[in-house]
Amino acid sequence: MQIYKVGGAVRDRLLGKPVTDIDWVVVGATTEEMLAKGFRPVGADFPVFLHPKSGEEYALARTERKSGRGYGGFTFHASPEVTLEEDLIRRDLTINAMAEDDQQNLTDPYHGQRDLEERILRHVSPAFAEDPLRVLRVARFAARYAELGFKVAPETLELMRQLSESGELEALTAERSWKEISRALMEDQPQVFIQVLRDCGALKVLMPEVDALFGVPQPEAHHPEIDSGLHTLSVLEQSALHKQPLTVRWACLLHDLGKGLTPEEEWPRHIAHEHKGLKLIKAVNERFKAPKDCQELALLVGQYHTHGHRALELKASTLLELLQSFDVYRRPQRFEEFIVACEMDARGRKGLEQRSYPQADYLRGAANVARGVAVQPLLEKGFKGPELGEALKRERLKALKVYKESAAS
C-alpha cells in the first residue's frame, strides 16, 4: 500500500499558496484493507474513505471510462493493479495531476510543474472532453489564478469549444452547475470566469441572456465602455474588488439582462430594460436553482437599480415605495445589499471606478428615517389593523419629505 497526496494540495504548495483541503490516493490496496485499518467508506460510486483520525479523504487509485452523457456518465474501476500514473491521467488539468509521497518526492508524469511555472492551464489527455463539467472548472481556475498570469492553453480552449458545441453541457445538473458558478463568482477575478466561458462558446449555451449583452451599445455619455457585456464584466469585477457576498455578485452579473432584448433600431437607449429583464433574470435563477436570497436580490436589483442611481431625484412617495418593496423594516440587510449592488453598477464604468456615489448614504439615511417612525403613538391613538398600516405609511411619508428637504438644503 502506497499513499500519495494529490491534486490541489500539491498544486497550491508549489504555488506557495495556503493548502486547505488535502486529498489522498492509495495505490495497491483493497477496500477490505482500508476497512481493516479503520477507514470509513463514503463513496457511493467508487471507493473513497475518511481517515479515522483526520477525517481527510483517501481514494483508491482508479481508472474511469465514459459510459453515458454528462458529468455522471462514467464507469469506474478500482483495484490494487491500478497505477498512480493511471489514476492521475483521468484528472482535468496537468497542474492538478501531480502527486507527492510523505517525503515530498514529486510524481509528475504529465508536466504539471512545468505548466505551473509557465502559467498555463492545460488538459491532461483527450479524455478531458468526456466531462462537460470541466469547462466550468477550467474557467473557474482561470478566474482563481488570473492574478498570477495563468491562461488557458489554446488546445484546451479548443476542446472546451468542442464540448460547448456538442450538447454535453445541457446534460449538467442545475446543482453541479451552480456549485461551480457560485465558487467561481467568489474568486478574486470572477469576470475572467465569464470571459473564458464566452471565449469557448459555453456562455452562449449556459447563460445566453448574459452572452446576448456583448455587442449591445449603451449611451457613451453614461457608459464610456459602451458595450453592455463589457460593462457587466466590469460591474462583476468591482463587486469582487469590494469583497461583496455571493448575493451581490450574482445580482451584478444579471442586473442588465433586459438590454439584450432592446431592438437594434432603439440602440443605444434601453427604455424599460429593468422591467424587460425580469423574465430573463427569473429564467437564469430557475435554470441553476440559485439559492432563494440570490434569486430575490437579483430580481430586485434588476427591477430597481435605476431607482438607486436616481435616488436623489425620487419623490418621497417613490422613495417610500422603494423601501417597502425591499421590506426594509424586517430585512434591512437586503436593502443594504441592493445599495451596494447599485454602487458597483455605477463604478463598473470605464474611467469612473473611483467616482463617489452619494446615492448610497442618501438611501441608507432614508431607510433609517422610515424605520425610525414609531408605531406606539399610533396605537395610542386607536389605530389598528389596515388603518394602522395606512397611518404608519402616512407618517413615514411625512418623515421622508422632511428628510428629502433637509438633504437638498
UniProtKB/Swiss-Prot annotation:
Q: How is the cofactor bound?
A: Magnesium is required for nucleotidyltransferase activity.
Q: Give its E.C. classification number.
A: 2.7.7.72, 3.1.3.-, 3.1.4.-
* Record-linked SUPFAM superfamilies: Nucleotidyltransferase, Poly A polymerase C-terminal region-like
Give the GO biological process terms.
RNA repair; tRNA 3'-terminal CCA addition
Q: Which UniProt keywords apply?
A: ATP-binding, Hydrolase, Magnesium, Metal-binding, Multifunctional enzyme, Nickel, Nucleotide-binding, Nucleotidyltransferase, RNA repair, RNA-binding, Transferase, tRNA processing
Which residues take part in binding Mg(2+)?
21, 23
**So which residues are the signal peptide here?**
none
Q: Where does ATP bind?
A: 8, 11, 91, 137, 140
| Obligatory cofactor(s) | Mg(2+); Ni(2+)
Alphabetized InterPro entries for the sequence: CCA_bact, HD/PDEase_dom, HD_domain, NT_sf, PolA_pol_head_dom, PolyA_RNA-bd, tRNA_CCA-adding_enzyme
Record-level Gene Ontology MF annotations: ATP binding; CCA tRNA nucleotidyltransferase activity; cyclic-nucleotide phosphodiesterase activity; magnesium ion binding; phosphatase activity; tRNA binding
PROSITE patterns per record: HD (PS51831)
Q: Which reaction does it catalyse?
A: a tRNA precursor + 2 CTP + ATP = a tRNA with a 3' CCA end + 3 diphosphate; a tRNA with a 3' CCA end + 2 CTP + ATP = a tRNA with a 3' CCACCA end + 3 diphosphate
Q: What else is known?
A: A single active site specifically recognizes both ATP and CTP and is responsible for their addition.
Q: How does it assemble?
A: Monomer. Can also form homodimers and oligomers.
Q: What is known of its domains?
A: Comprises two domains: an N-terminal domain containing the nucleotidyltransferase activity and a C-terminal HD domain associated with both phosphodiesterase and phosphatase activities.
**Family that this chain belongs to:** Belongs to the tRNA nucleotidyltransferase/poly(A) polymerase family. Bacterial CCA-adding enzyme type 1 subfamily.
Could you tell me what this protein does?
Answer: Catalyzes the addition and repair of the essential 3'-terminal CCA sequence in tRNAs without using a nucleic acid template. Adds these three nucleotides in the order of C, C, and A to the tRNA nucleotide-73, using CTP and ATP as substrates and producing inorganic pyrophosphate. tRNA 3'-terminal CCA addition is required both for tRNA processing and repair. Also involved in tRNA surveillance by mediating tandem CCA addition to generate a CCACCA at the 3' terminus of unstable tRNAs. While stable tRNAs receive only 3'-terminal CCA, unstable tRNAs are marked with CCACCA and rapidly degraded.
The name this protein goes by in its record: Multifunctional CCA protein
